[in-house]
Amino acid sequence: MNKDLAAMRVGYAHQGADGRYVDSDLDADQLIGGWLPLMRLWLEDAVEAGVPEPNAMTLGTVDEHGHPCTRTVLCKGLSTDGVLFFTNYDSDKGRQLEAVPYASVTFTWVPVARQITVRGPVERVSAEVTDEYWHSRPRGSRLGAWASEQSKPIGSRAELDAALLHAAERFPVDVDIPVRPDWGGILIRPAVVEFWQGRANRMHNRIRTSLVDGSWTVERLQP
């Protein structure tokens, strides 16, 4: 093992002058009202702490062989229904989620020593939801979605740049850029949500809430 990597660690002290933790201990009582209020609060805290791209999350899927695949995507909505992101449905992740409609996402906010993992079944959102978000995107992002056949091989960077130029010519500035027919939103409906909070000596706080027979259970896990 690389000795430099083996020696890398963080103490997760996050203590003030009085020796107490700057943030209060995570407790099961904080999830009595459900997973969403605390998740929104932690996301707001990450924003205020200046965490880069606080809505970035690692999305886990499995391919046709059962092999796990992960990548970073951006959360574009949180509601009682679940966690929302958008993608090309014909991309690797889109096809994998169509074949196995279950996913896991993890938000990791290192500067505040917090992490949330959400697992659950997925479904495509309505065309209306997709259209509303699509038209809120910058023009360049919409052109990029048309230019890229996501996850497909391409010969060179020059070919990719040429595809973007072609998309810009196809949709001039005065022309509305329509939603790609194979592009849209995917909603993860939470079945399990785990909140993790770093603490000294690796005695981290872990609280998991799970949907069981229509009701949410809450339990503390050992670190």
Curated annotation (Swiss-Prot):
It comes from the Bacteria. The keyword Protein transport does not apply. Signal peptide: none annotated. InterPro entries: Pyridox_Oxase, Pyridox_Oxase_CS, Pyridox_Oxase_N, Pyridoxamine_oxidase_dimer_C, Split_barrel_FMN-bd. Its EC number is 1.4.3.5. Pathway: Cofactor metabolism; pyridoxal 5'-phosphate salvage; pyridoxal 5'-phosphate from pyridoxamine 5'-phosphate: step 1/1; Cofactor metabolism; pyridoxal 5'-phosphate salvage; pyridoxal 5'-phosphate from pyridoxine 5'-phosphate: step 1/1. Coiled coil: none annotated. Its cofactor is FMN. GO terms for molecular function: FMN binding; pyridoxamine phosphate oxidase activity. The keyword Kinase does not apply. It holds the Pfam family PNP_phzG_C. Belongs to the pyridoxamine 5'-phosphate oxidase family. Homodimer. Catalyzes the oxidation of either pyridoxine 5'-phosphate (PNP) or pyridoxamine 5'-phosphate (PMP) into pyridoxal 5'-phosphate (PLP). This is Pyridoxine/pyridoxamine 5'-phosphate oxidase. It comes from Rhodococcus jostii (strain RHA1).
